[in-house]
């Protein structure tokens, strides 16, 4: 009887994270690094409740015996990304901004939309260009909920967060996207290193033509 009552008031929450685009063999690239916390919504709760690694399940974190109710899930991730964003990403976002190519999905859009305004335009090209040249060194990770096909990224607060209604055991699947990594080339075994420890990049110039945007992109990149 006690066990029954216990289950009526508590639940287990589980969240998994893998990197956008699996390996060539289709295997997920699980990520254990992101910090996930559930914050209660019925009270002021800035501390939150940490999700812990689920033994035997890479990329999965969970919390058992959670009080049922309304929560906000917040996801944070810090990881070195040196060299992951390069000229290929600049050209990729340039093609998207001009409508030459279309995004393959919400994750692709999150990678290309550098400033998070919902548009992919020359401002995003400039942002990715600055990052590829090392002018900017900030690595920003965004997360996407596979089930609802929605982004957790909130541009106003610069946080990854989503509402969770915990009325029973709940499991969600998230994808991690590195901002600016338009071709999803990030590989932790290669790029998870501090910029100063990495060799100095030799940035390739953008191919010039008569397009004003490209010429402007070149001139701005060298003056900043």
Language model features by range: what are they?
Residues 195, 223-224:
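Conserved small/polar residues in nucleotide/adenosyl-binding loops
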Residues 2-218:
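Cellulosome-associated attachment modules in secreted, modular CAZymes
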């Amino acid at each position: 009887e006690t066990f029954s009552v216990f289950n009526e008031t508590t639940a287990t929450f589980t969240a998994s994270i893998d990197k956008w685009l699996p390996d060539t063999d289709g295997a997920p690239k699980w990520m254990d690094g992101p910090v996930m916390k559930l914050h209660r919504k019925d009270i002021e709760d800035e501390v939150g409740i940490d999700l812990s690694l689920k033994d035997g399940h890479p990329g999965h974190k969970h919390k058992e015996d959670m009080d049922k109710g309304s929560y906000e899930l917040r996801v944070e991730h810090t990881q070195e990304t040196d060299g992951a964003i390069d000229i290929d990403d600049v050209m990729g976002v340039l093609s998207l901004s001009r409508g030459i190519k279309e995004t393959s999905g919400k994750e692709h859009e999150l990678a290309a939309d550098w400033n998070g305004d919902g548009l992919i335009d020359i401002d995003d090209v400039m942002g990715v260009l600055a990052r590829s040249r090392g002018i900017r060194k900030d690595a920003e990770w965004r997360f996407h909920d596979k089930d609802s096909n929605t982004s957790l990224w909130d541009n106003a607060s610069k946080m990854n967060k989503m509402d969770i209604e915990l009325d029973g055991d709940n499991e969600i699947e998230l994808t991690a996207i590195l901002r600016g990594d338009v071709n999803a080339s990030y590989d932790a075994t290669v790029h998870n290193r501090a910029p100063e420890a990495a060799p100095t990049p030799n940035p390739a110039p953008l191919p010039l033509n008569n397009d004003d945007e490209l010429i402007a992109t070149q001139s701005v990149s060298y003056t900043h």
